[in-house]
């Protein structure tokens, strides 16, 4: 019984220690297919390597939040950091700018990464 209590306490201590670890998110913005003006595509924002799990991600068109956005389930890597994919349909053209804005406890202000059509 005492052995079980010690093991349980060690597990609880290790889990509580995970909350103290903080890692800033890595943000990648890309399209599913090479960009062609006037051709429908998908805009993706892959956010990875962050901890804790609370995060806010917005896809932007000309600085304004895109409302019709979907995302994957929150998942975690072997190192217990988290990752997500946000995506939406879009049709690129010469004038519109697209970006991904992320808010996380590790960032003093939200970070915005622009989509580069040549990537």
Swiss-Prot record:
One of its GO terms (biological process) is antigen processing and presentation of peptide antigen via MHC class I. Heterodimer of an alpha chain and a beta chain. Beta-2-microglobulin is the beta-chain of major histocompatibility complex class I molecules. The keyword NADP does not apply. It holds the Pfam family C1-set. SUPFAM superfamilies: Immunoglobulin. The gene is B2M. Disulfide bonds join 45-100. Residues 25-114 form the Ig-like C1-type domain. Residues 1-20 form the signal peptide. It is found in: Secreted. This is Beta-2-microglobulin. One of its GO terms (cellular component) is extracellular region. Component of the class I major histocompatibility complex (MHC). Involved in the presentation of peptide antigens to the immune system. It comes from Aotus nancymaae.
